[in-house]
Amino acid sequence: NQWAGYANSLHLYTELLPYVDRTWIGEGFTENNSLDFWLVEMSGIPFGLLSETLDARNQYRGLVFGMLPRLPWSGNPVPLWNLWDQFGMKDAKMFGYWDKNSPVKSDNASLPATVYVNGKKAMIVIANWTDMPQQAKITIDETALGFKPTKFSEPEIRNLQWGRKISGLNHCEIMGRGGMVVFFL
């Protein structure tokens, strides 16, 4: 671009980042970018910050990186914000799919899984980075997680997913560009 050349425009402000608690660097980027692009260019994670998305398009992909949508011109992220509050996200620890110490692993690289752990409960977010339906087995390391999950459910998130109980994560099928949020206790 004309301001930062081949670098992300955020690099122009690197010296200010220690004084920032969230970034908003996804404007002008499409939600159809690659998984690596989301991590490096849009998420804020390389700078030790969380980012936000401009709108409510493909919220699952944003959630894989801890990104919530701002209150956009269209869409309604409030049910998702309420879910984070209900879960106690402010006290949770995030383990991204890239973290070697993550207690949750997906066997399909097109379906990365990020887990948020808060005491004896956890929330997994899985997003499909392809246009086609994908399947994955999600493996949970109970020792690393710190508890043995006994109940699994997909919470209802208005305009995002229907609520339902599920038996586990041995077989997850997710539509193209879709995703799922799962609670377990």
Q: Where are the language model's segments positioned?
A:
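Solvent-exposed strand-loop boundary residues in beta-sheet-rich modules
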Residues: 158-161
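Active-site-proximal substrate-binding groove within the catalytic cores of carbohydrate-active enzymes
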Residues: 1-151, 156, 178
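C-terminal beta-strand-rich structural cap/linker in extracellular carbohydrate-active enzymes
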Residues: 163-185
